[in-house]
């Protein structure tokens, strides 16, 4: 599956949009915040899989039922939005 397909089928759309903040940050905000950081796709993939909090406000992102490969595909796709 492509990143866009995973975004649509894995529940990401409930909290995230490409260019506007919903519950979580927009993908354009994520890309702007982390642009140029080495290894950021791996870091984001780990957050997608395990969940996390504290980076974008009080509401935590829950762990997501994705494989490591799916999480990496999603992270790489998220980071294409500028």
Swiss-Prot record:
It holds the Pfam family Cytochrom_C. Binds 1 heme c group covalently per subunit. Gene3D superfamilies: Cytochrome c-like domain. GO terms for molecular function: electron transfer activity; heme binding; iron ion binding. Keywords: Electron transport, Heme, Iron, Metal-binding, Transport. Heme c binds at residues 12, 15-16, 61. InterPro entries: Cyt_c-like_dom, Cyt_c-like_dom_sf, Cyt_c_ID. This is Cytochrome c-551. It comes from Azotobacter vinelandii. The lineage of its organism: Bacteria, Pseudomonadati, Pseudomonadota, Gammaproteobacteria, Pseudomonadales.
């Amino acid at each position: 599956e492509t990143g866009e397909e995973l975004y649509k089928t894995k529940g990401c759309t409930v909290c995230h949009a490409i260019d506007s903040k919903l519950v979580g940050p927009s993908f354009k905000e994520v890309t702007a915040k982390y642009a140029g950081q080495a290894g950021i796709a791996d870091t984001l993939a780990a957050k997608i899989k395990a969940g996390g909090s504290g980076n974008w406000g009080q509401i935590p992102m829950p762990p997501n039922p994705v494989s490591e490969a799916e999480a990496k595909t999603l992270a790489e796709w998220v980071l294409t939005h500028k």
